[in-house]
Amino acid sequence: MKKHYETDLDYKKRLIDRISPTYCGAKWYNATIWLGSGRTTSCHHPPAHNVTVKEVVVNFKRLHNTEQKKDDRRKMLAGERPAGCDYCWRIEDMGTDKVSDRVYKTMAYSDEDNLLAAQTPIDDDVDLRTLEIAFDRTCQFACSYCNPAFSTTWVKDIKVKGPYKDLTTDGRGHFTHIHEHDQLYDFHETNPYVEAFFAWWDDSLHRTLKELRITGGEPLMSGHTWKLIDWFKTNKDKSNTELAINSNLGFDLSLVNRLLDSTEGIKLSVYTSNESMFGQAEYIRDGLEWTQWLTNVTYLLESKRLKNLNIMCTINALCLDSLPEFLDLVAGLKRTYGWQSLYISLNIMRFPSFQGPLVLPEHLRQHYKNRLVEWHEKNKDEKLFGEFELNHLERLIDYLDIVKTPHSEGFELASHQRDFKSFYEQYDVRRGKDFRKTFSPIMLEWYESI
């Protein structure tokens, strides 16, 4: 963990570089696991990979300790860069003073745990300290940058209206089929991955985990989420694990109150998503009602029942149009409820690439970069945002200015720009939206030129 007098960069030099120039504690101690599909990864940046049913039936710790992760651990300790961690390498390659997410991921664990990881034999199974799980993909939203792998509303869209057409750069097929492999079991069927998780939870996870974070889909729509919450209520003396919920907060206050009432006496953090304002937010995050979302955010802050509330911003091309105003909103909430009551992260979207910020032409990237620079200069001295938050903003500014390709896969700008327009033209028809009435004149001028 970072010492109180250290900067993020100081911490990296003192601890991480001492272990290895490419070490990341998340590869040992963190996992995101999609139990509906039997897929796992060490954080939200590397592509997920499969875990077989046979593996988890024999050893439930294989939900995390896969051969691929063990090979990545070996590479990191040898100073090599695992290919799946390309997001962090691209941030760091912008300059030696740039802090990537692997620093923040590692910082979540004690110095002792990180040094122990370096000494643990590669073939050993490691106990998790932080875990994010998704039980299924049930979700009432169908955000533009999401897909059927993570949303049943997206599944319905593809089933009813068919695949999106003529997207030449979507090599991963985000929008062409219903991704049946991402929900292998119906809700009434026994899911061996869910059973393996609960077996591991009962055996040792409830003791080794610092934080359990439930995501989705929308996790408050899953019965398994409420089963876990009930476990916490009746076993408060058995676990020090803190509970966190990822939620789009797209529901009325009765469900918010159910969550608060069900977790009374439990350390709870809520992570919600948004990155733009008003109609632009409703356009990007289809299913969101702006007023409802903001009402729920304010209600949670006023309740003073949470450890903290976190807003995760998925930085895509469209949200840049009103991101400074969204940051103003967050600053206002911090002034009202205290700067530590609310945190924000700016997570740069890379897939689908044709929706990412680098699809924009140079003049628009510079325009949005300059607006963010202006916002940063105006607000940096008010002390409303922590070092982590300001670093996220500064690296986004640098990313818009310096980085030209979002990942190591092919990126031909003109083709991605054509797909940008093709997708949103179809999106408007399918979702009853209107790009031209939603975004700013400078964005629209470029859009019409494609």
Protein language model features and the residues they cover:
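Radical SAM enzyme [4Fe-4S]-AdoMet core and its adjacent flexible, acidic
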Residues: 1-64, 96-107, 155-158, 262-266, ...
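N-terminal pre-triad scaffold of radical SAM enzymes
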Residues: 25, 29-42, 121-149, 209-213
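Detector for the c-type heme attachment site
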Residues: 89-93, 146-152
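Short linear interaction motifs
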Residues: 7-22, 112-129
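Core AdoMet radical
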Residues: 128-138, 149-193, 207-225, 235-255, ...
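Short metal-coordination and nucleic-acid-contact micro-motifs, chiefly zinc-binding Cys/His arrays
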Residues: 20, 81-84, 132-135, 139
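A Trp-anchored, charged/polar loop motif used as the substrate-binding/catalytic surface
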Residues: 70, 112-122, 189-203, 253
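Cysteine/selenocysteine-centered motifs that mediate thiol-based redox chemistry or coordinate metal-sulfur cofactors
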Residues: 2-5, 59-114, 126
